Amino acid sequence: MDTLDEEQLSALKKAFDSFDTDSKGFITPETVGVILRMMGVKISEKNLQQVIAETDEDGSGELEFEEFVELAAKFLIEEDEEALKAELKEAFRIYDKGGDGYITTDVLREILRELDNRLTEDDLDGIIEEVDEDGSGTLDFDEFMEMMSG
């Protein structure tokens, strides 16, 4: 699983500490929902309860900071992945000039050159050969997505 960056961890710690008013080292499940919603995470009460139950490893009914981070990471990382997918979908749509659901390997070559101008023709050939396994000369969105997100 991916990890949170320093900025995200710092924001989570501040939120956790501000709701842990008695400095007991834990927060209630209700508070978790409030914090997640403040951070822009949309989650139903039912899903929240389910995730809290999975994350509350010691069964205390409260979440310690480590448990809270584990829970929040699931949503924050998932949100980042969704944003990446949306951006890639938009980029693909722009390059799919015919609107037929695929781009040619020539177009892919242009995209890769724009992303990294240090790539040699051999590098580009290697990447395209790897991505265009069937040799069709085209890539659909799923293949493009897989290549761009590793």
Curated annotation (Swiss-Prot):
SMART domains, per database record: EFh
GO cellular component: myosin II complex
Organism: Astacus leptodactylus (Turkish narrow-clawed crayfish)
Ranges of residues in domain EF-hand: 7-42, 43-78, 83-118, 119-150
Family annotation (InterPro entries): CALM/Myosin/TropC-like, EF-hand-dom_pair, EF_Hand_1_Ca_BS, EF_hand_dom
Domain of life per record: Eukaryota
Ligand binding (Ca(2+) 2): D132, D134, S136, T138, E143
Family label: Belongs to the troponin C family.
Family matches, as CDD domains: EFh
UniProt binding sites for Ca(2+) 1: D56, D58, S60, E62, E67
Function of the protein: Troponin is the central regulatory protein of striated muscle contraction. Tn consists of three components: Tn-I which is the inhibitor of actomyosin ATPase, Tn-T which contains the binding site for tropomyosin and Tn-C. The binding of calcium to Tn-C abolishes the inhibitory action of Tn on actin filaments.
Further information: There are two different troponin C in crayfish.
Pfam annotation, one family: EF-hand_7
Protein name: Troponin C, isotype gamma
Keywords: Acetylation, Calcium, Metal-binding, Muscle protein, Repeat
Single GO molecular function: calcium ion binding
N-acetylmethionine, modified sites: M1
